[in-house]
């Protein structure tokens, strides 16, 4: 929708830099807490890469009509198909390379990598492409009813949407803190 509304490149890059910065903080924090299973390609890392890819495709007009739906389906199906092919016919060296932290972000693996969060390019690029397709579909069919004055619930949801990265970055420390407090209280009794 941002592309359809004419979001400028400087505004896109500013938001993208925020996502990348938060992804780096997640990696550093998880490395500190979980040195053997730190997050090298989680939700924010995946979003940063996929935002670049999808925006690039959108501004070139390559995601029109059924294209994002078809490409999305291809990306969703590619991960399990390529992983099965790798497991049955791939070389052990290629399998080990794709399983490594340096390449597992592609999503062509035979087992889940040892990490606390993992959102690989395949299949998740497909889901983001479906989101781009859904946004375009909605944009083309919006009516005057869709631009009416928002009610209280809609304004609250819009506020959450505008600050979603902040909420995302706060939810893990809050949840971990609550779990640690619960554990400490449980151990005391």
PLM region descriptions:
Residues 1-189:
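Alpha-helical transmembrane segments and their immediate juxtamembrane cytosolic regions
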């Amino acid at each position: 929708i941002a592309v359809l509304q004419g979001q400028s490149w400087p505004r896109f890059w500013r938001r993208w830099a925020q996502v990348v910065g938060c992804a780096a903080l997640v990696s550093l924090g998880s490395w500190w807490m979980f040195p053997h299973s730190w997050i090298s390609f989680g939700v924010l890392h995946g979003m940063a890469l996929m935002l670049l890819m999808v925006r690039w495709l959108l501004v070139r007009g390559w995601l029109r009509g059924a294209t994002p739906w078809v490409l999305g389906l291809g990306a969703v199906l590619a991960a399990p198909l390529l992983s099965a092919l790798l497991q049955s016919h791939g070389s052990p060296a290629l399998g080990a390379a794709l399983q490594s932290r340096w390449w597992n972000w592609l999503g062509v693996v035979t087992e889940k990598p040892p990490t606390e969060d993992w959102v690989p390019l395949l299949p998740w690029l497909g889901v983001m492409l479906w989101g781009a397709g859904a946004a375009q579909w909605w944009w083309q069919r919006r009516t005057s009813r869709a631009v009416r004055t928002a009610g209280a619930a809609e304004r609250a949801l819009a506020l959450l949407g505008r600050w979603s990265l902040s909420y995302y970055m706060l939810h893990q420390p809050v949840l971990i803190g609550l779990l640690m407090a619960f554990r400490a209280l449980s151990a005391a009794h």
